[in-house]
Amino acid sequence: MKIGLNLSNDELKEMAERQNKSIEEVANDYKHALKELEYSNKKLGKIIKDFKYTKFPNDIRLHNYGKNNELNSKYLCYDNLKIFSKIPVNELAIVTGFGPTNSPTAGTLCSIFRVLELQKYTGIYTHIIISELSALNSRQKPLNELIQNAHQFISFIKKLGFDEKKGEIRTHNHHDHARVFALVSSVLSTRDLLENLEMTNDMYKRLQLLGNDFSKMVSRTYTMTDIILPIVRDKKRGVIVPVGLEEHHHPHLARIVLDRMKLKKGGVDSLVRQDAEIGALYGRLISGLFPYVKMSKSIPDSSINLGDSLEELHRKIIDCGKRNEEVILQMIVLASNWSPGKLIKAKSAFENLITDYKSWKKIKYEYLKFLIKLKTLWEKSEYQKEIDTYQEMFVS
């Protein structure tokens, strides 16, 4: 079902009232959103073509994961992955991370469920980084708020089933990370970072959500360090990075760093295996709620968020409007742990929503109920202590 992008005056008025903006401001946001949507669609295709990423569907498996079509249904493309099935599981690591700038969006939930599934079915040691110090540099958020949210994220992901015997969840306030950061930054240049910007950089810049130019570079170096750390500290041969395609620059730059570290004489080269590899799994994207390109924790109206009230969740899912029906389906498929049979039922209801909207609405109510359970779990994960910044940074 293809939805037109013409915005009516009534829609403009409703959005203006909800966002507490003038109609002119909303119209201007919409104009930018259309440009960003067109740009992002072209850019995603160009990234895949220019970097020669391999698209799904594909018959590739990752240590038997993928035999039930999981990779084809949840990922868009991959890079340098085939070799990883030949490397023993105990020589591999999975690395991903989440910025604790706000409550999890549907996009964040999607990434969490994907990495939990990868950990469970591959048996690969998994690192999840809650990047409070990276977010301090990349977003305009108070440090205490980021620390508090980081505690909540860690508790929440553990409650969802993260296996601590086969992985670790940590923040960026970590000695080993600081050591590896120095190694990574020693082989990076400003040009490397400027030539590999995040796809949504212009949108975040327009909305005044970014830190300064230097701090953004620091933030991105934090992420490269996350990827390199298992290779340096744990002597792993391979790191697999599950991430959205709009953030493909992270594993791409990390591979550049790794190649340079292998060549840097005088000690750095001895800290990485010469046969070390970095691969990436690029997940399918959930679109932002109309008119935004992607769901972002930093843009509340773009996303469905576990911090939303029950009334907001009902409005965004049940009363989403025809422009967002497909976004809700994307969420159901990607941001849930529903069984394959239940997902087939949801897809069928969506495909027939014009003639049988009642069945589709029933599916949406089931998903709303699922999200409310997650919301309750998120709220139960809240960090109860008052934040003492010094204690958190230097004692805990």
Predicted regions and their residues:
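Surface-exposed helix-capping loop/turn segments at secondary-structure junctions
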Residues: 163-165, 264-269, 377-386
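N-terminal Rossmann-like or analogous alpha/beta NTP/dinucleotide-binding catalytic cores
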Residues: 1-96, 100-227
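Residue-level recognition of the N-termini of beta-strands and the immediately preceding loop/turn
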Residues: 92, 124-126, 165-168, 237-239, ...
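Non-membrane alpha-helical secondary structure
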Residues: 29, 36-40, 342, 359, ...
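Active-site cores that bind ATP or allylic diphosphates and position pyrophosphate for catalysis
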Residues: 3-5, 9-13, 19, 23-24, ...
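C-terminal regions of mature proteins
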Residues: 366-396
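General N-terminal targeting signals
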Residues: 111-112, 143, 186, 303, ...
